């Protein structure tokens, strides 16, 4: 699962809408909803920016040290921890924690009525739906490459090209 910048506004709007409709949070006034959406977007954009920095530093470090791309995940995880974020399977939990903390401290949220666990339970499906775009994209790309044998150089090249096309078409680029 991966968070895409194009998905930030829909996620933020849906999270705030769901939390308001389930009466988990109460806002200071009707106009504050836009501000809370902007606060959620800010949390998500901050995560994306830090993740981008971690990815860039990981690539640089692997290049400088001559280590293989097979160590990317391990090095990325260590650098992410150094930068104070979680990546990979733990990213969803980390992002949910950040959004809950923001809701607790936001001046636009008058009251948080639900426990942290309930907030997370209401937000998680929204994030999973939008962050699961990766697996949908992968299924679509693989369906278009049935004529090639997986693992061959031609398959790798076509997979990358088709993946770019599908992501661009879906606005995930």
Residue ranges of model-derived segments:
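Short, tandemly repeated low-complexity microdomains enriched for cysteine and small residues
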Residues: 28-33, 112-115, 137
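Conserved mixed alpha/beta catalytic, RNA-binding, or beta-rich assembly cores of soluble enzyme
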Residues: 41-47, 67-130
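FKBP-type peptidyl-prolyl cis-trans isomerases
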Residues: 3-12, 19, 23, 79, ...
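N-terminal interaction modules that seed assembly of large macromolecular complexes
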Residues: 2-73
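Residue-level detector of well-ordered alpha-helical segments, enriched
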Residues: 7, 11, 54, 71, ...
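Short, residue-level hotspots on alpha-helical faces of the histone-fold
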Residues: 14, 77, 98-101, 125, ...
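Conserved, well-folded catalytic cores of nucleic-acid-processing
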Residues: 18-22, 61-64, 78-85, 102-106, ...
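Alpha-helical oligomerization segments
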Residues: 133-173
